[in-house]
From Swiss-Prot:
Organism for this UniProt entry: Penicillium roqueforti (strain FM164)
Gene, per the UniProt record: ORF5
Function: Cytochrome P450 monooxygenase; part of the gene cluster that mediates the biosynthesis of PR-toxin, a bicyclic sesquiterpene belonging to the eremophilane class and acting as a mycotoxin. The first step of the pathway is catalyzed by the aristolochene synthase which performs the cyclization of trans,trans-farnesyl diphosphate (FPP) to the bicyclic sesquiterpene aristolochene. Following the formation of aristolochene, the non-oxygenated aristolochene is converted to the trioxygenated intermediate eremofortin B, via 7-epi-neopetasone.
Cofactor names: heme
Keyword presence, Oxidoreductase: yes
Name under which the protein is recorded: Cytochrome P450 monooxygenase ORF5
Enzyme Commission (EC) number: 1.-.-.-
Length: 540
């Protein structure tokens, strides 16, 4: 268009030098050359761009292949549930119930968010109960299921080892429990004085939220010691971490795998989890430094902080981040399970007040023969009715649907020839074992003294205790895979219940009966909206 315009202009101006008339032709030739050159450049650029895109996509594919867990071959058993779509927890419970009934003694699978889980028949428990971690691994199972790298669910997320905390619980906490009972009792009394009103008349209490804080205080006394265990910022930190970490996991999982690292900056719950770790580092820094000095001099406190430092390798011992996370992880485990177990027991007692007097009579009889200021490690097991009531409550209101969850590390051949391949997730159906008609008489009915009566039979003294494990007692696992903290938890739970039963009458607000438990990922949780009425007992 510019060339035509120039030519017309020249025709109307005859005074212009004639050799200029040839310039538009040369300009046209130059423009054609330039367009041809530009075309070649653009073509080459497009080729480079396409090549760059292909390389980028290939790099992303390689990166994904590196971070994506390698899935084992699909297990040859019926898949009864798919959690990768919208989660229906009621359907999951129904599925596992039906699976246990329809495939009793056989395998079935659940497609969970983190991968396929093979539900094993209980007949294989005996051959798996003693296998070491390098064959059946808990750390890897938890890390994959709870996305620990991003959620900070376990100590592995900051470079530590779960085994360090486990060793502290096994080798120190459990063995010194007898010396800690006085501290546990003192903290239970203190926590009720601080958190429960006088209750001279019937007083409405948000019992579950109160118990979360009571358990945090009592556990903190053993985990970090006074005065930090009563520090409000410390208590808020461990409670908020416990609540936020469970909500954070499904939100992290919603991110594309390669972008999950961004959740730390973009997601409110994940940011809160990391903030809790930063707070714990700040709070624990002087305590950890002081404890290290004491340990070097051959002294030191009797608490989890000191035991974790003692059992740490050099890397863990030198890392404030790891030591702080150990406090968070241990507190989370205690607060989450213990508070719910106590709440369920209180709900069962409030719904069945006929059990209160026999439990009080048992406590009174024990005190008559052992007039101690508090229950010690040797006297606590003598409360057989209380132990039985707790076990029955736990049987019908478990924390989890499944137990003994593990990830297979090395090939394992079972006695029927089935091979469990590396990378596979396994579990046993806890809730269904607890409700098996072949194991329990009238399993759907609550019998608070069921296990006391079973223990009275010859040879059953230890078999049916609250902390007992076995093929028909999966609440705390089995064999080397049993929960190492169950003895501390049991004594803490009983101490709280003894104080409550001894000092208060309680009932539900209104004639509501036993409230239904709620479903959340993993199992039953007591309904947090339920309120309990407390009234202080007048004792002679």
């Amino acid at each position: 268009m510019a060339v035509i315009f120039s030519s017309s202009a020249l025709d109307s101006h005859t005074h212009v030098d004639k050799h200029l008339v040839r310039r538009p032709i040369r300009d046209l030739e130059n423009n054609v050359d330039m367009l041809d050159h530009l075309s070649r450049v653009l073509t080459l650029s497009y080729q480079y761009h396409a090549l760059g895109t292909a390389i980028a996509l290939f790099a992303c594919a390689c990166a994904y292949a590196l971070v994506a867990p390698r899935q084992p071959p699909k297990f040859p058993a019926p898949q009864l549930y798919d959690e990768t779509g919208p989660i229906d927890l009621i359907a999951l419970d129904k599925t596992i119930r039906e699976g246990f009934q329809n495939y009793k003694g056989k395998y079935f699978t659940l497609k969970e968010a983190h991968g396929e889980t093979v539900i094993l028949p209980t007949k294989f428990m005996e051959e798996l109960k003693a296998l070491p971690d390098n064959m059946l691994n808990l750390d890897d199972e938890i890390d994959e299921r709870f996305l620990s790298e991003h959620s900070l669910f376990t100590t592995t997320s900051v470079g530590g080892r779960i085994s360090t905390v486990v060793n502290s619980v096994k080798n120190e906490l459990t063995k010194t429990l007898g010396h800690l009972m006085g501290d546990i009792h003192e903290e239970v009394v203190y926590s009720f004085q601080e958190l429960i009103p006088p209750c001279d008349d019937w007083t409405e209490i948000d019992i579950q939220s109160k118990l979360v804080r009571i358990v945090a205080l009592v556990s903190g006394r053993i985990f970090v010691g006074l005065p930090m265990s009563r520090n409000q910022e410390y208590l808020d930190c461990i409670i908020e971490f416990t609540l936020n970490v469970f909500f954070a996991v499904p939100e992290i999982r919603a991110y594309p795998r390669l972008l999950r690292w961004t959740s730390r900056y973009l997601n409110t719950k994940v940011r809160a989890v990391h903030k809790s770790l930063a707070t714990m580092r700040r709070l624990m820094a002087p305590i950890i430094a002081g404890t290290k000095q004491q340990l070097e001099m051959g002294t030191g406190p009797h608490n989890m902080c000191a035991w974790n430092i003692k059992n740490s390798n050099q890397k863990e011992r030198d890392s404030l981040n790891i030591q702080a996370q150990m406090q968070l992880a241990t507190s989370m485990a205690a607060i989450h399970t213990t508070s719910m177990t106590v709440t369920n027991a209180i709900f069962d007692l409030a719904a069945r007040p006929e059990y209160l007097q026999p439990l009080r009579d048992e406590l009174q009889d024990l005190r008559a023969t052992e007039p101690l200021p508090y229950l010690n490690k040797s006297s606590m097991p003598k409360l057989r009715k209380l132990d039985s009531f707790l076990k029955e409550s736990h049987r019908l209101s478990p924390i989890s649907l499944l137990n003994m969850r593990r990830k297979i590390v090395q090939p394992i051949t079972l006695h029927d020839g089935t091979v469990l391949q590396p990378g596979m997730h396994i579990a046993f159906p806890l809730h269904q074992v607890s409700n098996d008609e072949d194991l329990w008489e009238n399993p759907s009915q609550f019998d608070g003294f069921r296990f006391q009566k079973l223990r009275d039979l010859p040879g059953n003294e230890s078999k049916y205790q609250f902390t007992a494990t076995g093929t028909n007692n999966l609440d705390f696992g089995y064999g080397v895979h049993a929960c190492p903290g169950r003895f501390f938890a049991a004594n803490e739970i009983k101490m709280i219940l003894v104080h409550l039963i001894d000092n208060f009458d309680f009932k539900f607000k209104g004639d509501i009966g036993r409230p239904d438990s709620l479903w959340t990922p993993g199992g039953y949780h007591p309904d947090p909206s339920v309120r309990v009425l407390l009234k202080r007992r007048l004792k002679a």
